[in-house]
Amino acid sequence: MWELVGLLLLILAYFFWVKSKTPGAKLPRSLPSLPLVGSLPFLPRRGHMHVNFFKLQEKYGPIYSLRLGTTTTVIIGHYQLAREVLIKKGKEFSGRPQMVTQSLLSDQGKGVAFADAGSSWHLHRKLVFSTFSLFKDGQKLEKLICQEAKSLCDMMLAHDKESIDLSTPIFMSVTNIICAICFNISYEKNDPKLTAIKTFTEGIVDATGDRNLVDIFPWLTIFPNKGLEVIKGYAKVRNEVLTGIFEKCREKFDSQSISSLTDILIQAKMNSDNNNSCEGRDPDVFSDRHILATVGDIFGAGIETTTTVLKWILAFLVHNPEVKKKIQKEIDQYVGFSRTPTFNDRSHLLMLEATIREVLRIRPVAPMLIPHKANVDSSIGEFTVPKDTHVVVNLWALHHDENEWDQPDQFMPERFLDPTGSHLITPTQSYLPFGAGPRSCIGEALARQELFVFTALLLQRFDLDVSDDKQLPRLEGDPKVVFLIDPFKVKITVRQAWMDAQAEVST
């Protein structure tokens, strides 16, 4: 009896404590919450988290809160509120929560993806952007992308009229692009380095996708945790591989020939070491560990994401062969077979660009953006958001809002075209496939170029159809850190028009 009374008093004390933290403030409506465990007992046990959070909007509205352990998290499910968080008040919400698994992957908050807002994060992010600017000179980036896309096509020629899984070949080609950007290095497709990169990249994505209780209850790290050990293992492999490549790059470094992200970071370190006016700056901002964390983030953000979206594009085209034929008709008409499609062809290959945009809508790279953190006491809409509150934008909710999208669960590339089909449009602001603001995807421009050029080259040269076993790709997906797609095969057939054109050239 007395135990029950004590429990009730504890619960009441907890709720009064929560209310007393922000007296008089208008807070977002909250899920029920209990001491210590927070709202966990009241969250759906089954289904994908992004879908469950979307459904909770029916009861709690487009902004609501919940407690995970002792941490308050605000869920955003409407584009106006999302844009307020990401853009209008981007600096106020540019922080990153320091969770256990993310700290493991970021070497305690280094790099650009999981680092908290601050001068070190801002500087490293700025240097990554300068790397992409470096590759824009003389269309160097597009040449690199075309080279790897052609390499993929050459491999596929050997599998004419076969049904194969393109996951690994696509992964290897995309990885080589990232290796060139980060290290000015490319590998043969059977090189053990590429295999090692594939192992740790896929391993980290898979391991971090599972809900790990230590991110909610950090004190659980005192107990053995199989999930954490798996993440540590893959992070160790990643660090060893990248360190080995980095050391070789440092040996060959030439300040007169800056050609990669690593070169830019090494040069910045040298400049910082020689500059005595950088008072107040973290002395370790360009330590080897900081540099490797940033390079590791580019690998994590630039490989599995693009690879996965390319597979989603192929899957939806197999399901919708009429869309594939429309794209090929555009390619035949405006590009032909005498040259390689380029990113500049977007103004003519409208159905292709619309298809890419629709895939990014219906299966966003990350259904929920990486959590943000309020750096100061702030507000979202009419609601108060105290400092250190975690904020999660549910991109799935934005991209599947029936008030903004007609039949949001249907694959309809034409929604991104005007009624005449002659101009690309953005039908609503409820579309943020790469996020926005200070924490937007740092490789958005690269990803858009890769998706367009790879898909254009593939459809210029091949028909990609349902596999011989007539098993269509599953479209449900597996939402980890990246929205993965289940393995599937496509039947590859070299297009007769392409073969005829090559025969003419050879004669």
Curated annotation (Swiss-Prot):
Localization: Endoplasmic reticulum membrane; Microsome membrane
Principal place of residence: endoplasmic reticulum
Biological process according to GO: adrenal gland development; androgen biosynthetic process; biphenyl metabolic process; cellular response to antibiotic; cellular response to gonadotropin stimulus; cellular response to lipopolysaccharide; glucocorticoid biosynthetic process; hippocampus development
Matching Gene3D superfamilies: Cytochrome P450
Keywords assigned by UniProt, alphabetized: Endoplasmic reticulum, Heme, Iron, Lipid metabolism, Lyase, Membrane, Metal-binding, Microsome, Monooxygenase, Oxidoreductase, Steroidogenesis
Binding positions (heme): 441
Record comment: activity regulation: Regulated predominantly by intracellular cAMP levels. The 17,20-lyase activity is stimulated by cytochrome b5, which acts as an allosteric effector increasing the Vmax of the lyase activity.
Function statement: A cytochrome P450 monooxygenase involved in corticoid and androgen biosynthesis. Catalyzes 17-alpha hydroxylation of C21 steroids, which is common for both pathways. A second oxidative step, required only for androgen synthesis, involves an acyl-carbon cleavage. The 17-alpha hydroxy intermediates, as part of adrenal glucocorticoids biosynthesis pathway, are precursors of cortisol.
Identification of the protein by name: Steroid 17-alpha-hydroxylase/17,20 lyase
Organism: Rattus norvegicus (Rat)
